Each structure stands twice: as structure tokens, then as C-alpha cells.
């Protein structure tokens, strides 16, 4: 009896050892100590990390940024045309004045928006500038996200909390994304990283 039990236990152990290990979730992408999970949920939809990188000003690390989409996209055009929910998540690596950040967004949108479309983004730009101008500063480690949900609009979250009104203009999110992905991006290597083309920016991002 004991021999049968022992043989059965041994066989079970061998079979368990041969069974494929459970698939483990991939480790988050880590940049300057900031971790970006490979998947997040936005308004009930699972999104995957399209790419992440660091925004530099000269040699100073300013913030990390990660772009989440329903499906991978490797060109600015594909990102802007992608259906479904989207998220841009930014974590500060140094302190920045809230009013200055709002002005930088406005300037970046102005530099990259089609000239004949820029005027219709002004109300949304003012809304977003207000979100940051009401904060004295964003410190290192603080974060903000910009979520887009079709049919609803663009919502800014600061440190994970929805801030300000939803920006209803459907094209506003794309106008905002052009700050990082447009013809005059905030940082060209960050643009490549957000598009998943990080090979040319890995050494700089470490």
C-alpha cells in the first residue's frame, strides 16, 4: 500500500515538473526609478504600453512618459488614428512650476497643430492650462495622466485623481499628443521611445 502511494506521489511530482510553468506577467519597464506596467485599465478597457522614455532638457532628466494604446502603433499617424481608449502618463523627475507647465503645453500644441485647426483647440488648451496653473508646482515623483475615451473626451488626472472638467473636443487629445509625436516634438528621442523604437534611446534612458 505504502509503495503504491509512494509511486503515485513520485509520478505526480514528475508530471508537475514537466508541466509548463505558468506564464508570468512581464516585469514593468523601469526608467530613472519609475516603473511603467505593461498593461493598464482606462474606463474599463485594457491598454498596453506602446512605449516609454525620458524627456531631457540638455542633460537634465525632466520627466518620464509612457503611452498606452489598445494596440501597438509605430508611427505618429497610427497613434493618432488608433481607435479606442488611450492614455499618456507622465511622472516628474524634477520640480516644475505648475503655471510654467501649462504654458509649455500651450506652446507645444501651437508649434505642432495644423494652422487651420489650431483655433478650435483654444478652449481645451485654456482648460488644461487652468488645471496646472492652479497648482503651485509639481514635485519630483508626482504624476499626471491624460486619458482619452471616445464619445466622452479627454480627462486630466493629477496623482491619479481626475482634475478639471472633461475636454469634450474629440480632436483635442490628438492635438495634445502632437506635443510629443508631432513634427516639432518636445524631445526627438522621447518621440522614438513612445513609438516603441527605443533601440536608439536606450543608452540615454538609463
Task: Identify what each model region corresponds to.
Residues 24-82:
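N-terminal secretory signal peptides
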Residues 165-188:
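Flexible glycine-rich active-site/ligand-binding loops centered on an Asp-His dyad
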Residues 19-23:
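Sec/Tat signal peptide C-region and signal peptidase I cleavage site
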Residues 72-151:
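Mid-length scaffold segments of soluble, non-membrane domains
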Residues 33-36, 148-152:
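A short, compositionally biased
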Residues 188-206:
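Cysteine/selenocysteine-centered motifs that mediate thiol-based redox chemistry or coordinate metal-sulfur cofactors
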Residues 158-161:
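Short strand-turn-strand beta-turns centered on an Asx-Gly dipeptide
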Amino acid at each position: 500500500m505504502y509503495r503504491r502511494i509512494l509511486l503515485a506521489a513520485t509520478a505526480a511530482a514528475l508530471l508537475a515538473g514537466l508541466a509548463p510553468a505558468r506564464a508570468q506577467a512581464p516585469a514593468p519597464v523601469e526608467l530613472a526609478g519609475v516603473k511603467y506596467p505593461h498593461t493598464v485599465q482606462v474606463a474599463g478597457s485594457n491598454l498596453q504600453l506602446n512605449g516609454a522614455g525620458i524627456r531631457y532638457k540638455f542633460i537634465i532628466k525632466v520627466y518620464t512618459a509612457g503611452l498606452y494604446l489598445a494596440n501597438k502603433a509605430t508611427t505618429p499617424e497610427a497613434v493618432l488614428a488608433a481607435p479606442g481608449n488611450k492614455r499618456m502618463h507622465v511622472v516628474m523627475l524634477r520640480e516644475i512650476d505648475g503655471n510654467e507647465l501649462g504654458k509649455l503645453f500651450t506652446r507645444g500644441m501651437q508649434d505642432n497643430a495644423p494652422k487651420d485647426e489650431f483655433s478650435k483647440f483654444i478652449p481645451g488648451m485654456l482648460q488644461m492650462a487652468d488645471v496646472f496653473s492652479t497648482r503651485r508646482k509639481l514635485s519630483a515623483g508626482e504624476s499626471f495622466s491624460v486619458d482619452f475615451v471616445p464619445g466622452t473626451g479627454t480627462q486630466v488626472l493629477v496623482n491619479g485623481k481626475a482634475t478639471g472638467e472633461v475636454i469634450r473636443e474629440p480632436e483635442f487629445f490628438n492635438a495634445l499628443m502632437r506635443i510629443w509625436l508631432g513634427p516639432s516634438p518636445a524631445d526627438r528621442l522621447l518621440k522614438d521611445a513612445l513609438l516603441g523604437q527605443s533601440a536608439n534611446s536606450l543608452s540615454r534612458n538609463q
